[in-house]
Amino acid sequence: ACALTGYTPKYGLLHEEARRPNLRVQVTATLTEPADFSILGDWFGTQRTAAWKMPLGPMPLISGLPSDLTHEQRKALTAAAANYGCPLLYIEGQGEIPEGEIQAELTFGEAELAARYEELRPKTAVSLITIGCPQASVGEIRAVAQLLRGQTLPADAPPLWVFTSSANKAVAEKTG
């Protein structure tokens, strides 16, 4: 309806008071790879309980992250968080953070990181490997290329599909 009328009703997250942190997540684990950040975003979404009154979803205030997150790390964190109903998040030390009513406090340590990796580990043979949801960045394409450079994969290795935009593909091809 909004596309047809050109109007958007002011509701939900369009109200400033609705965009306040309601969950505190203290990160004590060492996160380096984009996959680690994806695991973090996925993890706090899975911690939600019926007792939490978060009609618009968990909106965590995350502390303990490095101040120099890469584009790939930020993308991995936010994409995974969105998959589990988190419409937005705040990172301590990054921008202005409004005061919010914190309903729960969680700690994400090495044990939580390892346990979530184990839960998500394939339990059967992998038939296809996909990268790029959301679309792979140039940095992610470079990382895949670096991992595969000089490797000879077995004939029965599953196919690898990398999804990206035409612009990122062009940059990756041009820059090697």
Q: Where on the chain are the PLM-derived regions?
A:
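Intrinsically disordered, low-complexity segments enriched in small residues
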Residues: 2-166
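Short gly/pro/ser/thr-enriched loop/turn and capping motifs at secondary-structure boundaries
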Residues: 168-170
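Thiamine diphosphate
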Residues: 174-176
